[in-house]
Amino acid sequence: MNSNDLLRALSVPQGPVDVVLDTDTYNEIDDQFALSYLMRSPELHTKAIYAAPFFNENSSGPEDGMLKSYDEIFKVLKLLGERAEVYKGSPAYLPDEHTPVVSPAAEDLCRRAKEYRPERPLYVVAIGAITNIASAILMDPSITDRIVVAWLGGHGLDFHDTKEFNLIQDVAAARVVMGSGAPFVQLPCYGVVSAFSTSRPELEYWLKGKNPLADYLCRNTIEAAESYAAGTAWSRIIWDVTAVAWLLNRDDRFM
């Protein structure tokens, strides 16, 4: 990829683009917002959705997290009344920076990326541990000239640590992607995206009672926030939406 192609790839796209989404959808409540936003944006053509691994209190391990995310993707698609190609991702994190974890998601990205070129790349929106994307790059490094990666991960460069959930789960994968030469747009969490939040009054005003999907998003978010902040005037960061929003940020209308 020459410098002109790289600069163009790092700029917000100016028209309709093809997108794949890599998501740990069951991890918490924000991936569902991001998936819904992507599917409902006419300028973004969703070509595939990949289930990403995660491990926290909502899963018994990375593979369980990936499988639960796979199921959650279909749940959201059903509420949307939409269909999409959905692929299971890595059952484990990278063992090192040289060994891919082969999965249907990584194989699809390797195959699909070949249909694109530097002047018309495939946009890869990643909102979880970036294992699937790193694995695809390790399996076929030539795809780095054909994709643009927008990742929600890490913290702002002036933040006091880098112990961010998506990054710390698979540091090797983050190193692979960042060092691969693929055009890479980072949406840092604390210090940047942490400003993007919603509240119970906003959720109830804009979503409650509108449709089954809106009710699901509203209920999920309120229940999650009330589990630790009941009785207070809370707000909840909906991190993952920003990675999709970057693709729609023409003329700096959002950021």
Labelled PLM ranges:
Residues 1-255:
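N-terminal acidic, glycine/proline-rich low-complexity segments
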